Regions:
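Flexible, surface-exposed loop regions and adjacent strand-edge segments
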Residues: 29-39, 87-92, 128-137
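Intrinsically disordered, low-complexity peptide-like regions
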Residues: 36, 71, 95-96, 116
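Generic, ordered loop/turn and secondary-structure boundary motif
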Residues: 45, 95-97, 120-121
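Exposed loop/turn and edge beta-strand positions of beta-sandwich/beta-sheet ligand-binding modules
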Residues: 50, 66, 95, 110, ...
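C-terminal beta-signal and adjacent terminal beta-strands/loops
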Residues: 76-83, 103-166
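Short glycine-rich, acidic/polar surface loops and turns
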Residues: 98-102
Length: 166
């Protein structure tokens, strides 16, 4: 189930947005891993049960010919397994917060932007798996989760940006 909302409020320039998703992603068929496990009936990898976001933007005139926009968003993800095995390692649930401030010309030719992403510096696993070329000294599931490598999203970032459109 998914739902999206975009509300143009009665306050000029203020918009509110939100998204919500509920998922019950389960391996319904036979799926045999390299370690011999059948994942049938287990939770799918990288599939949080609940995810969503909430944000607001405010856009207004600053001076003759110039406008500003302030925007902030908070995104939530429930915990999820990041391996392809039964009882795989899990990424804990998390919140990510972003903010931006823009000063731009009404004709759209110039814009100055300050963008902050992942302000809480939340390090989140986005993918993971066995390290290629490693030979385990054990067998079964424990061998599969011995030597794992993960990819994470970026931590806190700030960007100062200028755009010019011809």
């Amino acid at each position: 189930f998914e739902a999206d909302v975009l509300w143009y409020t009665e306050i000029p320039g203020l918009t509110v947005r939100g998204q919500f998703a509920w998922s019950d992603a389960t391996n319904t068929g036979d799926f045999i891993t390299p370690g011999g496990e059948n994942l049938k009936g287990s939770e799918r990898s990288y599939s949080p049960e609940i995810a969503g976001s909430f944000g607001i933007s405010y856009d207004a005139s600053l001076t003759d010919g110039w406008r500003y926009n302030f925007s902030t968003d908070a995104r939530y993800s429930d915990d999820y397994g990041w391996g392809v095995y039964i009882d795989s390692p899990r990424q804990d649930s998390f919140w990510i917060n972003d903010v931006s401030l823009s000063l731009y010309s009404e004709d759209g030719q110039h814009s100055f932007n300050l963008i902050g992403r992942n302000l809480g510096d939340e390090i989140v696993i986005v993918t993971g798996g066995a390290v290629p070329g490693r030979i385990s000294t054990q067998t079964g599931t424990s061998a599969l989760i011995q030597d794992q490598a993960v990819t994470t999203q970026q931590g806190r970032t700030f960007t100062l940006q200028y755009k010019y459109k011809m």
